[in-house]
A protein has these predicted regions:
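Canonical Rossmann dinucleotide-binding motif of NAD(H)/NADP(H)-dependent dehydrogenases/reductases
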Residues: 2-36
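A hydrophobic alpha-helix adjacent to the NAD(P)-binding/active-site core of NAD(P)-dependent oxidoreductases
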Residues: 110-111
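A glycine-rich helix->loop->beta "capping" turn
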Residues: 57-58, 78-91, 97-103
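Rossmann-fold scaffold of SDR-type NAD(P)-dependent oxidoreductases
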Residues: 11, 85-97, 114, 132-140, ...
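C-terminal helical subdomain
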Residues: 120, 223-226, 231, 236-289
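Catalytic loop of short-chain dehydrogenase/reductase
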Residues: 95, 99-103, 134-216
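Rossmann-fold cofactor-recognition segment
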Residues: 52-70
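Conserved Rossmann-fold cofactor-binding substructure of NAD(P)-dependent oxidoreductases
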Residues: 67-83
Length: 289
């Protein structure tokens, strides 16, 4: 079945930023679109979708644990069967980590959700993207090579590596954290930073391979940095949240990527409030005598 109604999907959407993005997109599309609000807990997903539906928004609850490859593929197949394709996908699901829990006890869930979950979503939903469609991964401004020591940059050589290579890189990183070797290898102290770099790398790798077709079809594939958002996941890590945005405020720029005109220069890049955050700093000019 092919639908002429716009179809959107947001993961990790039963709360926080994801819920605000789903609501904002449904509000922007109105009767012209339907948004799948997904998460891994059926009760929370159903409650969130029901609340938005009571507000007059066209949302559909969907249970999808991005840590489960079969669940992701199954949801993609159901949407393909019902609608023939998708117009907007936000891979937003993220694992909440705590300062009070050893990194070795958290890193597997973090990587499986944030990174392997993102590449599962990209592989499953990228091929379903319709002409003019957009696929974004929610990341952060930590997700650039500037956050990583130079000797580790080659681990994220997005110009040449595949998504499979990247999956192995982040698995190797998780292994290093669990074994206690990560610090000695020079990885950042906060495990969220390599995870965010991996998310942006996934976008860059997939976008590289799809560039010609995506440009022809007017599609956008990018990572988005919403900035500091006051959510359950962020509060334990920041003592001053006075400048944090509410989820609804932060969702505005994400929804713009779904509904506004496509800026070709944003393709494959990390975008924050309409501005591209460079993956790597330009090489310094070589001076000659």
């Amino acid at each position: 079945m092919v639908s002429d109604v716009r179809i959107g999907l947001v993961t990790g959407a039963n709360q926080g930023l994801g819920r605000a993005v789903a609501a904002g997109l449904a509000r922007a599309w109105g009767e012209r679109g339907t948004v799948y609000l997904t998460g891994r807990d059926r009760q929370r997903v159903d409650e969130a979708a029901a609340a938005l539906a009571r507000a007059g928004l066209r949302v559909v609850p969907g249970v999808c644990d991005v840590r489960d490859g079969e669940a992701v593929q199954g949801l993609a197949q159901r949407i393909a069967d019902r609608h023939g394709g998708v117009d907007f996908v936000d891979s937003n699901a993220t694992a909440a980590i705590s300062p009070g829990v050893p990194d070795a006890d958290q890193v597997d869930d973090l990587i499986n959700t944030n990174n392997l979950g993102a590449t599962r979503m990209i592989r499953a939903f990228g091929p379903l993207l319709r002409p003019g469609g957009r696929l974004v991964v929610t990341a952060s401004d930590f997700g650039t090579l500037a956050s990583l020591p130079a000797h580790l940059h080659s681990r994220f050589a997005t110009e040449t590596m595949s998504l499979g290579d990247l999956d192995q890189t982040v698995r190797d990183y998780a292994d290093a954290v669990r074994s206690g070797a990560a610090a000695g290898q020079g990885w950042p102290e906060w495990i969220n930073i390599p995870s965010k770099i991996g998310q942006v790398a996934a976008v860059r790798i997939y976008a590289r391979g799809q560039r010609e077709q995506a440009m022809h079809d007017g599609q956008l594939i990018s990572a988005v940095c919403p900035g500091l958002v006051d959510t359950r996941a962020s509060r334990p890590w920041f003592t001053d949240m006075s400048q944090a945005q509410s989820p609804r405020q932060a969702a505005i720029d994400v929804v713009k990527l779904a509904t506004g005109p496509i800026e070709p220069q944003m393709y494959g890049e990390l975008v924050q409030r309409g501005r591209i955050l460079p993956w790597s700093e330009p090489a310094a000019a070589v001076q000659t005598a």
